[in-house]
Amino acid sequence: MKKSFIHQQEEISFVKNTFTQYLIAKLDVVEVQGPILSRVGDGMQDNLSGTENPVSVNVLKIPNATFEVVHSLAKWKRHTLARFGFNEGEGLVVNMKALRPDEDSLDQTHSVYVDQWDWEKVIPDGKRNLAYLKETVETIYKVIRLTELAVEARYDIEAVLPKKITFIHTEELVAKYPDLTPKERENAITKEFGAVFLIGIGGGLPDGKPHDGRAPDYDDWTTETENGYHGLNGDLLVWNDQLGSAFELSSMGIRVDEEALKRQVEMTGDQDRLAFDWHKSLLNGLFPLTIGGGIGQSRMVMFLLRKKHIGEVQTSVWPQEVRDSYDNIL
């Protein structure tokens, strides 16, 4: 049992270390330290889809403030790029750890504990567009494939990802599969192509509903791009044979500028957020234009090591029935 546990841990470390090295080199970012707590009231917390309640923390020696365990570092990263004067084309990546206790379900792919490569880059002049989003997605996908090939060479786990990733807009997808639910559409398109970047998540589709929820103040999901489609963000999905379904590895996007922020908070009824310090800074032009996202560490390890449950590659909390159903839960 001990030998198996140690081998399991070595595999996890190999995937994480290999991916980190490739990501820093190919995406041209520097690794930095990030926070676990966010001060309530400054607008820095990531509200995700807007329904998740963060973990509140009171600090004894800071009695006049309340803090929350971060959901992600989407806003903190952009603030940090501005604070330290990062130039166009430069960026950072954080080994981010977070808690999301309001996950709808604790299952094979969802955990209370979240670990991500949380990255952000300053967009070069004139590149706040769909072409640059796709270029960045292709870079990250290349990192995933290089890591998969390294795992194949070391552990004899056959590489399965296609050489190229397929791009499709959510509007195209609903037209292609009008009778399917969003999750069923993801499964159908990802099974067909193996690896897909689904563009435009957060805005309303022809039926008036979004493909999935997104907060209004980090990704730009409303800007018109091509052929009447909207959104400069999306999810990177791969086909997972272990689960028989599409599997999200990353969510990313070009971030809101002043106009997109005002437009999106009005659409979601969140205009009150514009009173926060972070949002005021953005509206006053104090932040650079950026692109960023999160890449799930445990999900990446789970996929590349062909595990059936995320609890096999991370230590979290699970209902007893989950522990009873899987022998290798950590």
Swiss-Prot record:
Record carries keyword Isomerase: no
Record CDD domains: AsnA
Catalytic reaction annotation: L-aspartate + NH4(+) + ATP = L-asparagine + AMP + diphosphate + H(+)
Subcellular locations according to the entry: Cytoplasm
Superkingdom of this protein's organism: Bacteria
NCBIfam families reported for this sequence: asnA (TIGR00669)
Protein name: Aspartate--ammonia ligase
Lineage, top ranks: Bacteria, Bacillati, Bacillota, Bacilli, Lactobacillales
